[in-house]
Amino acid sequence: MKTVNELIKDINSLTSHLHEKDFLLTWEQTPDELKQVLDVAAALKALRAENISTKVFNSGLGISVFRDTSTRTRFSYASALNLLGLAQQDLDEGKSQIAHGETVRETANMISFCADAIGIRDDMYLGAGNAYMREVGAALDDGYKQGVLPQRPALVNLQCDIDHPTQSMADLAWLREHFGSLENLKGKKIAMTWAYSPSYGKPLSVPQGIIGLMTRFGMDVTLAHPEGYDLIPDVVEVAKNNAKASGGSFRQVTSMEEAFKDADIVYPKSWAPYKVMEQRTELLRANDHEGLKALEKQCLAQNAQHKDWHCTEEMMELTRDGEALYMHCLPADISGVSCKEGEVTEGVFEKYRIATYKEASWKPYIIAAMILSRKYAKPGALLEQLLKEAQERVK
């Protein structure tokens, strides 16, 4: 890994406008802007390892809005806020005036008087999560423009119906660390494959995030799933266009074995079919509990037809030299451990368990880098100042 000074030099050489926009989809950011987030994250991680404080805010709130359950991302966001010197406040919509009809515009302004960051997870409703984030962003823009807010908080997508940028960027940071550089990722084959799970309704945003980001860096990306387990068509088109622009490739197959063959990286992860998620969204909005039960039963039966989509030792033998890097956003459905039959065998997961933990360890720094890059036009100069002051972190 590069030194902090080398990372700062790289950051200063990049052309970025991240301080002027929210980080909601990776494919809305330029290659330089993606690299800036990676480099700032790496610098923050290195500074913390040297026990140097990275508290760039003396006060301020970081608001969290979780409309779905979370462990890793929730704690990663809290860690990122603390890393930068912000205090966390969770917005419980059930205990707020939102439950009584308060508008998004009003809520966004009322919670932001002293806020420097807002992180939102909203992945339950297909076609709604990312749109909600943009509505919040527009309300914040208006509040700042009208003089209601003294500053415009950074808005971070902590997972929506379309993308999971903090996850995919953490995955990319781990790949850069593992393989040595972004340049070394060119030509590497990554297999983003569906895998069997005894549960249904898992979001599309993780596989969509992977194909939408890894195609930006000249990788050979293979998306594999049984027939009918499609992703959002628009995101698949994004991946195709990205691959053409980066000199990589993108293809879709309906065989896990074909995807794993000669792969350098494998990412076996369950998700619900796009059409099912559309139905589920309609039923959730209609509060149709019986319809949801029927859909779940139907989907679990459909999943059960594909139990052979299982990351086993034999499947891993098909990869390059039998030693592909296994990745997962966690928690994985581990056969015989967290479930009877799932995405991956205990043996394969145990072999790569520490690797997946290191993968996850990048997320707090990625989130912190997104916030810092939105709030400061020259993050390189700020990091240089932190290094110069070298104030020891209070343990």
Regions inferred by a protein language model and the residue ranges of each:
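Positively charged, low-complexity intrinsically disordered leader regions
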Residues: 1-75, 79
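Phosphate/diphosphate ligand-binding glycine-rich loop within oxidoreductases
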Residues: 55-176, 334
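Phosphate-coordination loops involved in phosphoryl transfer and adenosine-cofactor binding
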Residues: 56-62, 186-189, 323
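Glycine-rich phosphate/diphosphate-binding loop of Rossmann-like nucleotide-binding domains
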Residues: 67-79, 176-290
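A short helix->loop->beta-strand "cap" motif at the edges of active sites that frequently abuts
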Residues: 146-153, 219, 318-327
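Rossmann-like adenosine-cofactor binding region
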Residues: 241-345
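Adenosine-phosphate binding glycine-rich loop
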Residues: 319-395
